[in-house]
C-alpha cells in the first residue's frame, strides 16, 4: 500500500515541470490524481500518459482545465474531481508564472499578471478547497508552492518575489483560520529547478539584458547552492508526497525549503 493510497488529490500547473512530477509521484504512491492546467490539451496528454502509472500504483487519474484566477473554473475543477473520485483530500496550489523585468521597468500589467496567478490564484485555490473539505466534513490538506524567492528578494524578478512572499503569508494565515475545520495548510519552497519555466526565465533575462548567454542565470544561481547543482523535479517530489501523506498530518503553517542549501533558515 502506497504512502497516499486512497487520497484524492488535485495538482494545478500540472501540464509540465514540478506540477507534473508532483502528480506522477502521487500516482506512484497510490493516490487518485487530477492533473489541472490552463493548457487543456497538454494536461490531457499528461493524464493520458499517466494511465499505466496510475494502474500500477493502484490509483486513478483524471484531468481538468483551470484558470486559477477564475473562481468559476476552480470550482468546476474541484467538482469534476469529486465526481471522479468521490471526494477531495489534498489540494496542491502549484500553478505559477514569472516574467523578469528590470526593477525600474516593472509595469502594472507585469505586476498584475504575476500577482494574479501566483497570489490571487493561490488564495482562490485555498478557499475553494477549504469549502469542499467543510462540505464533506472531513480532514483536508492544502499544499502551496512557494519559492526560494519567498525568503529573499532577487534582482529583475521583484513581482515574482513579492508574490511568493505572499504565498508564505497565505499559508500561515490560512493555517490559523482553517485549523478549526481540521484543515492543514503547508507549503514547499523549491530553489533552482531545471524545468521549462526556468528555460523561459533564462530567455527573458537575456531579452532584458540581464544575461548575455543561454544558461548564464542558472549558472550564477547554482554557484551558491551547497549541493553544487540545480534540482530536478524528482528532487522535490519526496517532500511533496510527504506533505500529502498522513506522515505530515500534524504539520501546518510551515514552508519546507527544498533548495539544496541556497538559503539557510
Show which residues each predicted segment covers.
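Conserved glycine-rich Rossmann-like NAD(P)H-binding loop of the short-chain dehydrogenase/reductase
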Residues: 29-46
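Active-site loop immediately N-terminal to the catalytic Tyr-X3-Lys motif
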Residues: 101-104, 152-158, 180-181, 228, ...
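Substrate-binding pocket helix/loop in short-chain dehydrogenase/reductase
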Residues: 102-103, 110-112, 221
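C-terminal substrate-recognition "lid" of short-chain dehydrogenase/reductases
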Residues: 123, 229-258, 263-264
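Active-site helix of classical SDR
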Residues: 126, 163, 171
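Residue(s) in the substrate-gating loop at a strand-loop-helix junction
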Residues: 147
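Short, small/polar-rich loop/turn modules that mediate ligand/substrate recognition or access, typified
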Residues: 179, 184, 251-253
Amino acid at each position: 500500500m502506497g504512502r497516499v493510497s486512497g487520497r484524492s488529490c488535485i495538482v494545478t500547473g500540472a501540464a509540465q515541470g514540478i506540477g507534473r512530477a508532483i502528480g506522477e509521484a502521487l500516482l506512484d504512491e497510490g493516490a487518485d490524481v487530477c492533473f489541472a492546467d490552463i493548457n487543456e490539451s497538454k494536461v490531457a496528454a499528461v493524464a493520458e500518459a499517466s494511465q499505466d502509472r496510475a494502474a500500477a500504483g493502484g490509483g486513478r487519474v483524471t484531468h481538468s482545465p483551470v484558470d486559477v484566477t477564475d473562481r468559476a473554473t476552480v470550482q468546476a475543477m474541484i467538482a469534476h474531481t469529486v465526481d471522479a473520485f468521490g471526494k477531495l483530500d489534498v489540494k496542491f496550489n502549484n500553478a505559477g508564472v514569472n516574467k523578469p523585468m528590470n526593477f525600474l521597468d516593472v509595469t502594472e500589467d507585469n505586476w498584475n499578471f504575476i500577482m494574479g496567478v501566483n497570489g490571487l490564484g493561490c488564495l482562490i485555490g485555498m478557499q475553494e478547497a477549504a469549502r469542499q473539505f467543510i462540505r464533506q466534513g472531513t480532514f483536508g490538506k492544502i499544499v502551496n508552492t512557494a519559492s526560494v524567492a519567498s525568503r529573499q528578494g532577487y534582482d529583475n524578478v521583484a513581482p515574482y518575489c513579492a508574490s511568493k512572499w505572499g504565498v508564505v503569508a497565505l499559508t500561515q494565515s490560512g493555517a490559523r483560520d482553517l485549523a478549526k475545520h481540521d484543515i492543514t495548510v503547508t507549503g514547499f519552497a523549491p530553489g533552482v529547478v531545471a524545468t521549462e519555466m526556468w528555460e523561459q526565465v533564462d530567455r527573458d533575462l537575456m531579452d532584458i539584458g540581464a544575461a548575455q548567454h543561454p544558461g548564464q542565470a542558472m549558472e550564477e544561481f547554482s554557484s551558491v547552492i551547497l549541493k553544487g547543482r540545480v534540482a530536478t523535479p524528482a528532487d522535490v517530489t519526496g517532500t511533496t508526497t510527504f506533505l500529502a501523506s498522513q506522515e505530515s498530518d500534524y504539520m501546518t503553517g510551515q514552508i519546507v525549503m527544498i533548495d539544496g542549501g541556497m538559503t539557510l533558515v
